[in-house]
């Protein structure tokens, strides 16, 4: 599944267009590599997403085309959440 679609389906980012913009800005890495919106992701991949003043590391646990809102968080597991220091 494309990265931008996964981010939207999992509700890590609300809209696919916003997910695409975040990817274009280089704020997401997949397994340590800066990712584009079209990067294919699979179970076991590690995403690091820069949200404003924090870095969130998640592992993809499941990939589905559609899920209900209540089940969206079952697609990933948050591994780490840390603030970004001012020097970065």
From Swiss-Prot:
Keyword Ligase carried by entry: no
Keyword list, A-Z: Protein biosynthesis, RNA-binding, rRNA-binding, tRNA-binding
A GO BP annotation: translation
InterPro entries reported in the protein's UniProt record: RqcP, S4_RNA-bd, S4_RNA-bd_sf
Keyword field contains Transcription: no
Superkingdom of source: Bacteria
Pfam families the record matches: S4
UniProt xrefs under Gene3D superfamilies: RNA-binding S4 domain (3.10.290.10)
CDD domains registered for this protein in UniProt: S4
One Gene Ontology molecular-function label: rRNA binding
Ranges where the S4 RNA-binding domain occurs: 1-67
UniProt family annotation: Belongs to the RqcP family.
Subunit structure: Associates with stalled 50S ribosomal subunits. Binds to RqcH, 23S rRNA and the P-site tRNA. Does not require RqcH for association with 50S subunits.
Function: Key component of the ribosome quality control system (RQC), a ribosome-associated complex that mediates the extraction of incompletely synthesized nascent chains from stalled ribosomes and their subsequent degradation. RqcH recruits Ala-charged tRNA, and with RqcP directs the elongation of stalled nascent chains on 50S ribosomal subunits, leading to non-templated C-terminal alanine extensions (Ala tail). The Ala tail promotes nascent chain degradation. RqcP is associated with the translocation-like movement of the peptidyl-tRNA from the A-site into the P-site.
Protein name per UniProt: RQC P-site tRNA stabilizing factor
Organism expressing this protein natively: Halalkalibacterium halodurans (strain ATCC BAA-125 / DSM 18197 / FERM 7344 / JCM 9153 / C-125) (Bacillus halodurans)
High-level lineage: Bacteria, Bacillati, Bacillota, Bacilli, Bacillales
């Amino acid at each position: 599944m494309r990265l931008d679609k996964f981010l939207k389906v999992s509700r890590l980012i609300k809209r696919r267009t916003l997910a695409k913009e975040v990817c274009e800005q280089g704020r997401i890495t997949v397994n340590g590599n800066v990712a584009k919106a079209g990067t294919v992701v699979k179970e076991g991949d590690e995403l690091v997403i820069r949200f404003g003043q924090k870095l969130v590391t998640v592992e993809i646990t499941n990939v589905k085309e559609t899920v209900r809102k209540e089940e969206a968080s079952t697609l990933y597991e948050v591994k780490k959440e840390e603030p970004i220091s001012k020097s970065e």
